[in-house]
Amino acid sequence: MTMTDPIADFLTRLRNANSAYHDEVTLPHSKIKANIAEILKSEGYISDYRTEDARVGKSLVVQLKYGPSRERSIAGLRRVSKPGLRVYAKSTNLPRVLGGLGVAIISTSSGLRTDRQASREGVGGEVLAYVW
């Protein structure tokens, strides 16, 4: 069965595993999910991720990050642009999440970028998700 919105599924699995205090979450692999995981790692929301070859297809294993007393690194995740309603932002009107404390993940013509990277490069694109 095909999935309508694999990015929303990825974010939902992360949100559920994070709220259940799991150490890692396994999900189906795709290039865009791996790129989102790379952004989350570089911004400090997850500790690491890896790709594993499964019997059928690849899987992406994301290791969640918690503080010393098990406080969550990810306070919230929200899918912005959906298959039924795409949301785009110009380079002059990029969104800021919680006044710059969070991150907006934007799909640009030069790949996935955070809102700060896209602003620095002067590119806009589709706003995929907010993470804070």
Swiss-Prot record:
Keywords: Ribonucleoprotein, Ribosomal protein, RNA-binding, rRNA-binding
A Pfam family assignment: Ribosomal_S8
Domain of life the protein comes from: Bacteria
One Gene Ontology molecular-function label: rRNA binding
GO CC aspect terms: ribonucleoprotein complex; ribosome
GO biological process, one term: translation
InterPro entries hit by this protein: Ribosomal_uS8, Ribosomal_uS8_sf
Matches recorded under SUPFAM superfamilies: Ribosomal protein S8
Free-text function comment from the UniProt entry: One of the primary rRNA binding proteins, it binds directly to 16S rRNA central domain where it helps coordinate assembly of the platform of the 30S subunit.
Similarity section: Belongs to the universal ribosomal protein uS8 family.
Subunit structure of this chain's protein: Part of the 30S ribosomal subunit. Contacts proteins S5 and S12.
Name of the protein in its database record: Small ribosomal subunit protein uS8
Originating species: Mycolicibacterium gilvum (strain PYR-GCK) (Mycobacterium gilvum (strain PYR-GCK))
